Amino acid sequence: MTKDMTTGPITPLLVNFTIPLVLGNLFQLTYNAVDSIIVGKFVGEDALAAVGTSNPLMTLAILFINGVCLGAGILVSLAFGAGNTELVERQVSTTAIAGSVFSLVFSLTCVILANPLLRLLQVPEEILPIAVNYLRIVFGGLLFTFFYNFLAATMRALGDSKSALYFLMISSVLNIGGDLFFVKVLDWGSEGCALSTVLSEALCCVFCLIYIRWKVPVLQLGRRWFIFDSSLLKKTISYGWTSAMQQATVQLGKIAIQAIVNTMGVNAMAAFAAAGRIDDFAYVPQQNIGHATTTLMAQNRGAGKKERVRASFFCGLKLEFLYAIFITAVCFFFAEPIIRLFVTDAAVVHLGVRFLKLVSLFYLMPSLTNGIQGGFRGLGDLKITLNSSTLNMAGRVAAAALFVLLMKMDIEALPYSYVVGWILMLVYEAPMMVKYLRKGEL
């Protein structure tokens, strides 16, 4: 069901739209943990290591595609907010056609480059064949990844975040069921796990299309799914490419940080992995609030309602601030019991607690950066979000390399490197947002 977000109280609209986004991502994080448990338990340590070492590349490809869909979704929100159903149809069909061609080319490229990319990451020879096979199967299904993310992004752009949540839950349940069947019953190893991922996304695409046919009249395009509007393509590429590059930049930064952590020893790696799981639960809702703010602003911008655009932005910032206070308190005061959920070794727990307590003190900073980025996306200025994310990751990686590799600091150096990145991000973003406010463009 679509939701017109250009009327009604803004705070309830934003909260109700954000909650399914948060639940969906938390569900995805939980699934990722279960997926690793199944591989580790029923296949073995080599397979788990192969899947684990493949995940950064797999995540990079998926986030790139997700970025394309996010950028295209903003254009759909603008058209829907303006009440231009015909433009919504042309935007959706054009993105679907162009995205399909791109996904097939991207998929083939990734399949070919899987081996050299894994070698670049210095994957041990004994698990390299397992990792290559796993990655090639996942990369082979990137067309389904695109359509699943595109349909979900389109429904969110139309104000329907609940349906996207339901389909994410269905996909995750299918994936877990497929993992158990292919891995435990058929004994297909990590390849079975990869096949389960591809098939679950393919089935979810079918379910999405059935639902759209049944419940979303504006997307019941029929033959119009094959309409390609070249006049829309340039803007779609601009939004999609910029958003995709931002997502890719963030993931590349994470890979670089992990490489630096790997030089600190096994205990630090384990502590960082445990604390990193908690970090995900801290950051993801902040990102979701930013994405919800984007949709609300874009619909109202399309409708020409400047006051609601401005009010939506500041409402998003307030929610970001409130969540930051909550998650800071939880992670600081309950750091040790939370870390012990993941590890039991005393030395690892000690390192993990130190990291989590320190980084939690700065959670207000990413809440501000995510809120501001949501605002820029809602205004259609994605270049600023790309530039600020690049500054963030460059500063973070450079600071981590300085603190850890040159100054030989321990795990407590990493939160400070995060702060360097966030400060650079805010120093760049804040003046830009002030300019928008002073010019009356927000």
Predicted feature locations:
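Interfacial/gating helices of multi-pass transporter permease domains
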Residues: V39-T59, E125-I130, S190-C193, L232-Y239, ...
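Transmembrane helical elements of multi-pass membrane transporters/channels
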Residues: N16-D35, I137, Y148, S171, ...
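Short alpha-helical transmembrane segments in multi-pass integral membrane proteins
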Residues: M1-T18, V76-G141, V185-W241, M297-F362, ...
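Short runs within selected transmembrane alpha-helices of multi-pass transporters and secretion channels
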Residues: C69, I137-R156, A164-S172, C193-C208, ...
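Small-residue-rich hydrophobic transmembrane alpha-helices
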Residues: L48-L108, T145-A164, A271-A335, P366-G380, ...
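Helix-terminus/linker motif at the lipid-water interface of multi-pass membrane proteins
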Residues: L26, T30-A49, L118-E125, F181-W188, ...
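N-terminal transmembrane alpha-helices
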Residues: M5-F42, P56-G71, L75, S100-S107, ...
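Hydrophobic transmembrane alpha-helices of multi-pass small-molecule transporters
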Residues: L60-L63, N175-D179, C204-L209, F281-V284, ...
